[in-house]
Amino acid sequence: QAQSPDSGKEMNIDEIINEVVKFKNCYRITITGGEPLLQEAELEELVNRLSMEYDISIETNGAHPIKKSWPVSWVVDYKCSSSGMKKKMLLKNYKVVGTHDIIKFVIGDKQDFEDAVYLISRGASIDPVYAFSPMFKDGKPVVEINELLKWIEEEEALEYLRIVINVQIHKFLNIA
């Protein structure tokens, strides 16, 4: 658990928008969670009200259907084998993401990497960015970034794809 249960503040859509507009010269918003799609109706209203003024991305855990018709970009997690959540992933999500979207893999071991390569090789979608992120345990990466880079470099199936390493700085700093 990244935060204490009593952290945060419950807000309605108008209150959220009032907070967002306080940030001058801000044109991009990322909505994350928890899982934003658990409040789908409210999320859709928020997106509709903000999308004329802001570029919006939504980070989701991959277990709920994404809404491709929404004017947003998606960051869709794919939970690999070591997470124990692989069976909860909705495979159709990975077929509808496109060039403005990201599929993110959290890698804890070589099997996780192979899960990611398998999904990608099945023609997951139309040219998204594929982000590989090392899993962390006790404030340290379970897979060293250099090892992850080596796996990526050696995997022919990834050769011409848009691949990034997603390093979550707050985890290196042991902040949540």
Question: Over which residues does each language-model region extend?
Answer:
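Auxiliary Fe-S-binding modules of radical SAM enzymes
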Residues: 18-23, 109-176
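Active-site beta-loop-alpha junctions enriched in small/polar residues
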Residues: 34-36, 61-63, 79-81, 106-108, ...
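Radical SAM/AdoMet-radical enzyme domain recognition
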Residues: 41-130
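Conserved Radical SAM active-site core
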Residues: 1-73
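Residue-level signal for the start and early helices of compact helical domains
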Residues: 2-4, 20, 27, 69-71, ...
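Short coil/turn linker and secondary-structure boundary residues
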Residues: 8-12, 89, 111, 140-143
